[in-house]
Structures are given as C-alpha cells and as structure tokens.
C-alpha cells in the first residue's frame, strides 16, 4: 500500500488505495483459495491465498466495481465510491455454491489514513457563505473549529483553543500565507483556496504527523484537481462572482505526455453586507484574485507542476455617523458619533511555485521524490485619518416611561482622532525536497513500512514602517492629561527591517500490519527538526500516533492515539510588541499534545442502509514559553515576550451522514477549557459586587470558548430533489476579553455575549443535461447544470458582537461600546457548470 500525499499525482498505480479482505464459504465459514478478485474496467486482478485473503492496489479518486469469481461458486460484485490515496478498504465476500438458494453477503469497512478528516467539496458548495472563502465551511465539518470573534465577516478560524496564526494551510504541498495587517473582518478579502478548483481536503485538529510542519493547532491540506477533460463554471451573486476553466490535452502521440490546466478567477464585494452595520458610511470594498495550477507529464516517471496566485484587496471607507445603545434594563448607554475623514487599505499578495516529481515504475516497494520551490510576496498599506465627535450618555429604559430613550445624564463628550500610515513588505522564498519509500513484507504484503523524509530552506525579508497614533479628547481635555504638554494615546512610530533564514527537516515511518482475525494496526513515528538564524534556536520534536481497527468487533470502529511535541517558531506578528519594537530573541512557543479518539462507521435504515460516521476525540495540550495576546475583532496583538504557560483540554464530537437520503449533513459539538498564567505575576479575579480581588492560579485565554455547536443540514422536497434546502446553524459561548492597557493582573475577566446565527439557503436546479431529450430548446441547454439560490443570512436578525470600542471620561473611567456584526440580508446566487 502506498500512502502518498502528493498533489495531483495519478501516474500508474502509485496514487493508490488498498483493497483487502477475506473470501469465504457462507455455509461452512471456511476460506476459499484461488478466487479471482478483479476490477474489470482497469484489467487489475489478484487471487485469494490459502487463508482466503486477498490484497489489490487500485487507483485513488475513482468509482470502481470490485468483482470476485471462483469455479463452483456464484460470482459477486461490489461498487466502490472514490477514496483518498492511502485509504484501506476491507471488503469480505461470503460466497455461495452455484446450487445454493442463499444470497451472497458482502461486508465493507475502511481505515482512514493518518487520523485526518477528509471531505470532498461537492456537497459543501451549497453552504451559505458571506465571505466567499472556503475556510468559512470548516466550523461545520472540522473537529474543534470555530469562527472566532470575526464572525461571518471573516474566514479566520480557531482550533481547539488556539488562534488563527497557529494553523497550517497547504495547497498542493505548498504552504500558503495571508496578509498580516488586517484589523477587522471588513478588510478581509479572498483567501488562497479557491473552492471551484479543490478536489478534496484533509484536516487535522491536532496530533498531526511530523511531515506537516511547525504550528501549535491544526493542518489544512488541500489538493486541487488534475483535470481529465474540458470543464468550467460561472457563479454570480450580490456579493461577487467567480469563474473557472479546466482541461487536459495529450501532447503528441505518446499517451504518457499530457498537459493539464486549471484556472480560476474571483471577485468579491461585501458592500451589501456592510451597509447593515450600525456604523453608517460609504463602504467601497473591492477584492479579486486569479490563480492557476498547471501540470505536465514528461513521461511515465516524471511530472512537472506549477501553481500561481495574484490577489488584490482594496478597502475604502468614509464613515458618517453611528448610534449604538447597550446595557441592561436599569443601566443603558447610548453612543452617538459623527465622523470626518476616511480609510483606504490596500493589500496585494502574489505566490508562485513549481514542483518536479519522480515516481519510477516499480512492481514492488514504490518510491517517490518531489522537488519544490516557491516564493510569496505581499505589500500591505494601511492608511486612515478619522476624527470622531462622540457623545456618551445614560438613557432612560423604563417600560412605559414618557422619557424612554431620552438622555438622563451625560457621561462623556469629546473627540477621538485615529491616524495611521502603515506599510509592510514581506517576501518568503523556499526550496524543499521530500520523498517516500514503501517497504513491503510478507507473502501478501500484509506488513509495510512507509518511510517519508524532507528538508526545507526558507529565506525571509521583512520591511515594516509604522506611524500609528490615537488622540482622545474628553471635555476639552486631551487624555492622558498633563498640565504642560498634549500627550497622544497609543503612539507607535517604528522602522523595522529583518532578514533571516529558516531550515527544517523531518523523518517518519508508518508501519502497517494486518493479521486475519486481529484487524489492522498502523503505527506512525517521526521527528521534526528546525533552526532559525534570527533567534539562533534549534529544536527537535518527536511525534507518534497509533491507529487500530479491530477485526472481531461487530462495530466498524477505528481507535486513535496520538501525541508529541509541537513547537511554533515566531513569525513577524508574534515578535512585534504593542509599542512596535521587534524582539528578535523571541523563542518558539511550545506545547505537548495528547489526543485519543475513535471513528465509528455504521449504517441505519429500514428500506435502505444509509452510512453514518461518528468521530469523537479528547485532548490535552500543555503549553509553555507562550506569547500572550489580545484579540480585537480579527486583529491579534502579541506582547512580544515568552512570558506565559498554560493548558488546553477538551472534547470534540462530529456526526455526519445522509439523514435525508442523498443529502449529507454534519453536526459538530465541542467543549474546551483554555487557561494561561503570566510567569512571575499573581493573577486576580474580582467577583461581582466585590471591592477586592482574590488570587487565582490561572486566567482564561482569549480563545477560551467553552462550547460551540454547528451544523449544516440538507433537505429537499419530497419527490422533487431539484429543490434543496440547506440550513447552517452556529452557536458558541462568548469569548473572554479584558480592558485595553490593563489586562494583565485581572486578565480577560469579561466575556462577549454568546454568538448564535442561522443562515438558510434554497437552491433550485433549473437545468440538467439529462433533460436534453425532452427539453431540447431550453435556454440553458449548452450547460451541464444550472442552479439558482436564495440565501438568507442571519435569519433571526441576531446582534452578534465582533469587538468593543472603548471611551474614557474625564474621570478616567473606561466604557465599552459593542461593535455589532451584520444584520439580516438576502442574497441571490446563480451557478452554472459546463462539460
């Protein structure tokens, strides 16, 4: 069995799945030898041995039919849905004699590779999304994943108590990056992954292998399609548009020389959504990107690949006015503000990569080697100069009062002036070589070692220019107030230039053994090493995991245990303190993970057996050398010091299946506890009504979201599958936050309100090519299929909070006013596919 994660490789049978099982007599239970097990369409076959066991390698990602025949017995066949490379499918055939009146019985079970959650995108494209980004889907399908405080305006996600910077993202084995200066979800444009180009994805919420890199939380591994024919699609809505084209062409007469192309372009504007915010003004967001993935099969053994992306995000905003009320029945505040000035942000990113893959044709012990090179570049400009004349007042909220809504007392009246001229230029270049070799042992290859290794060199150039300040004037006094000088608040003026080199490598072995009657055992162990020239830190991380699928259990269950050390070396944002000073001696953040879980595949149904999958995992992460941070909307502000330790523990569960035949749905629920403590500092907590604080051992991390629940449910009209309904529900307890500038001793003592949101979509199939014979004059007959959708965002019109705006009175008392996310909006969408 060859367990590969090479993007797009489909040469010979190296990108394979393993089909294995037992052929036996249904009446006696004895094994049947010399039974022919074959796939007719591919001319692949094998025979069962003396113990009735067989093993057959087949191409991944294809629909297959496995057949078995034996002289004197009735033949049997079993359809196989497309599976990912590295999957093992166990199919047992209980055959009957030709003279018997019994029916053949076939049992299937599958062992997924590496403890990763894998999904295809066909059913997920209908999920209502306000961002247009693929990552918005993750909270509905991935374990322990939430959307964070950015809510529906952001595609950032938190995994098991970590922040967004702790997540790895790969597309076709290339690591991808995102802009660093984003402050809010309003500025966020299009992320790298293009849903129109994705073939499948793998996601690990923790305990991942050594080959995946150096982050604390998760891995998202995306593979783009390798086309086999000419296809395309067009999509349009009130929030933007997208289009893609793909194709494959044989070069010359040699069938092994083939060129494939995949090109996609997207445009996004969330002006329609932003106009529902309480901060009124002229929003002009324009986001666009274009990307391509090309491959060329040089011959049987060599393949050349190239990937490219150019992304531009421009956000223009002229604020006009704002009126926000907040508080309780007996104490409510209203903020009224008028604005002058504007904000213009410009983010331009580009990425290009090439790969050369060698897979020699071998009958046994397959091998692959892959050479990769890539470059990423971003130029980010953030400019704003906005003056706000604000008025903060206590208002009457008594029911039935004649003065309801009127001011009772003036709390603050002043001017807030924010200014920024920030520039960040970032360039990352890397070279990488990785490989894999599978050693097969045993008469039926029931024992295998899959060795994988890789080395990588990375160069980073960073230029940062910050000119950022705020002036707060309350009752004609500039705060902070002095008798002689006008002192600005939060002044940052720095010039930082960094050049560094990173080197990393890994080695791991995956040992798989199958024994009749015992099941399949897979043990993976590896080490990861890295060095960074800037802080001169070298580390060595061992990681391991065990997957076991018992054969004697009545239930189809796979058990998993994983653990190891996971270090995250700092990138630029972690090193930059709130005052703009960069700490080049900052060491990596460190953690030790333990993850235990199970995957249960089962079927239910009276008339037809419908497959379901239940995944459950518990985990514990010990943290040290942590860099504390505060989250404001989507902006993460680090302290720039290794000054904290902590832990994260929790439970994740996911259930998915066809609750409605032909329409798959997902249900996710997670519980976690994330705590931290600053070294050398005694934290305190002040309970409501208490004047004095009491000592506590630790405090909540900013991502300490106790519970999250999300679901994506699909249904359709009875007897009419052309009209589909999909519901997206997200519920999460509030995340903690603290007072700006005073969030250390009494750290993260407050919480945002709970987040809850319902998005509803209706999709109607208005054309399908199968109708051509009876509708040969249809307006859309040139298309393969066409859908029209109506999406209702925030169906319940809930006011969810993204962040707070803070104001001070002349008495130096701080008041927080919530910044709410979007209200209810209706979106129209049209999608057309060509083939």
Model-identified regions with their sequence ranges:
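Periplasm-facing N-terminal accessory domains of Gram-negative outer-membrane beta-barrel systems
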Residues: 13-103
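Periplasmic N-terminal accessory/gating domains of Gram-negative outer-membrane beta-barrel systems
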Residues: 74, 81-89, 110-208, 219, ...
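Transmembrane beta-barrel wall of Gram-negative outer-membrane proteins
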Residues: 233, 239-269, 279-319, 344-368
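Face-selective signature of the C-terminal outer-membrane beta-barrel domain
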Residues: 297-312, 342-535
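Surface-exposed extracellular loop regions of Gram-negative outer-membrane beta-barrel proteins
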Residues: 320-322, 550-595, 618-641, 728-740, ...
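Membrane-embedded beta-barrel scaffold of Gram-negative outer-membrane proteins
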Residues: 370-374, 381-386, 588-658, 788
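Gram-negative outer-membrane beta-barrel transporters
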Residues: 512-519, 620-622, 642-739, 831
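C-terminal beta-signal and adjacent terminal beta-strands/loops
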Residues: 722, 730-740, 764-835
